[in-house]
Amino acid sequence: MRGWSRLFLLANIGVVLIANWEILPPVTACPACVGTTGPQLSFVQQVVNCDVALCARQTPDRRRFAIQFCFKGQLPQDGEIVLPAAELPQGRIPKESEVVLGHESLSQQWKFLGTISPGHREWLLAIGPMKRTADLSESDWIERSRFFLGSLDRDEPLIRETVFRELSRTPYAIMRACRQDLDAGLLLRSLKPDRFPERRALVALLLGISGGPVADQWLAEARVEESRRREGTTRAALLVARLEREGAVALPDFLREEIVAASLREGERRSALLALSVQGTADGAIPRQDVVALYERVLEERPELADQVATDAAAWNEKSLVPPLRRILNAGVVSEGARESIGRSLESIVGREEYRTDRDPRDE
């Protein structure tokens, strides 16, 4: 369990995806989706890392590609691109497909980015000027998310995979701002979560926001399946959706059923805390002050979870949680690793000098 806790804490703090210039700050992506998209960069991230991106057709010489159109940067003067042998795609490229190539800014080499069927020129032209997520304002995020939600009806594998990966990198508060753009039936038909299990967490979050009979039925069935298996990666997302649908009035039941029940495993309890964290950070369906009040009860009944609560206390600069966290530190009921994590969080909230003045002698 201790190893799981460390992994969870890393995921909750965030995942930094670094590739040349594209960096995903840990505070942006909804943590209930962290880890579901895999380590590889999304199509958009790859385009961001290129100074030129274009569509081409493969010639009889497999390494040569005839340029069709450019959707980012300046069109090369030569009408063909010669791809390094190491960058050639695995297997055969369908004759009807266009090939997307990018000239990477840092390595100054051409890269194979994927294949796409003809007829998506306008979509690619919209992708070309997209910015790093680190540079997006709230309005930029909303516009970007609405663009990808509007792409769900395109029956094109590259586009649907891109939509999944980009929405998975979206802050939960932005997802909520796009509520009117969510269509539960379209989400299920397009993202096919039963066929692609890695998409289930994102779909659960979006269906929790969209609501309606179709969404509620899928969420209910998914919760039954998760309860049966007790090892699913979508538990946190399903609990976020539960909180979104039921609101703050359900918090007492949520605490009893999902956090303090004796039958729960530590991982299940921490998934529930992650769901509370997502809602508290968004400060929407569940106001942050209600999450903080529930955290006080968590610290009383499950002090072994204090390190995770402390992470949110630091992120929200929530001083009301400092006294109970200090009491837990002084009681010596958590592991050494948890003590260090809680100590760093307290220092972040109250400042180094005040923290060192008030800390327990055992921390010296």
Model segments located where?
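Amphipathic alpha-helical repeat scaffolds
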Residues: R146-D153, E161-R165, L188, K192, ...
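Short coil turns that connect the paired helices of HEAT/ARM alpha-solenoid repeats
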Residues: G150-L158, K192-E198, E225-R230, A261-L264, ...
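Terminal, non-catalytic domain-edge segments
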Residues: L346-E364
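N-terminal secretory signal peptides that target proteins for export/translocation
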Residues: M1-S5
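Bacterial N-terminal signal peptides
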Residues: L10-E22
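Transition segments tied to proteolytic processing and entry into folded domains
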Residues: E22-D155, I159, R165-R169
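Structural detector for internal amphipathic alpha-helices that build alpha-solenoid repeat scaffolds
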Residues: A126-E138, E161-A177, E198-G212, T233-G247, ...
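Amphipathic alpha-helical scaffolding segments comprising HEAT/armadillo-like alpha-solenoid repeats
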Residues: W141-L149, A173-R189, G212-E225, A248-V260, ...
